[in-house]
């Protein structure tokens, strides 16, 4: 939803900028228009939820640790309860392209790693393999995909 400047003005609260209040009919129209940003956002969120539901490392009781990936990337590592699946959840929180050295993640080299979101594989070969992030891109790097 775009910034709701009228709501900020009416309430006097800056946080109201992202607190748009929908009526049911307008929301239904927006979500049923497949070309609307609202329908696209909902579709993308549903796809991410479907991916998460299939991955044991996203179980609520799975192990989780935050990672130090520098100032541009927020990350955390999750491991399934049976320890078979690891997922590195990495988020570029900037509006610029950024890179993370795969060596900094301590990936197990004998596993095949792929991004659950894009479906692309990650090549661990080379002298200094890197992950490249587009602005605000998320990568869920997993050793076992289901």
Regions found by a protein language model. Name each.
Residues 1-107:
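Loop/helix patches that line or flank the sugar-binding groove of alpha-linked glycan CAZymes
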Residues 104-119:
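Solvent-exposed beta-hairpin/edge-strand motifs
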């Amino acid at each position: 939803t775009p910034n709701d400047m009228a709501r900020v003005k009416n309430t006097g609260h800056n946080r109201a900028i992202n607190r748009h209040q929908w009526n049911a009919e307008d929301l239904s129209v927006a979500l049923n228009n497949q070309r609307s940003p609202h329908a696209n956002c909902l579709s993308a969120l549903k796809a991410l939820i479907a991916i998460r539901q299939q991955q044991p490392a996203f179980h609520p009781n799975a192990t989780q640790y935050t990672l130090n990936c520098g100032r541009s990337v927020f990350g955390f590592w999750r491991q399934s309860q049976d320890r078979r699946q690891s997922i590195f959840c990495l988020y570029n929180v900037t509006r610029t392209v950024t890179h993370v050295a795969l060596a900094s993640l301590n990936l197990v080299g004998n596993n095949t790693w792929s991004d659950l979101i894009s479906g692309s594989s990650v090549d661990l070969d080379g002298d200094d393999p890197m992950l490249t992030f587009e602005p605000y891109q998320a990568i869920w790097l997993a050793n076992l995909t289901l």
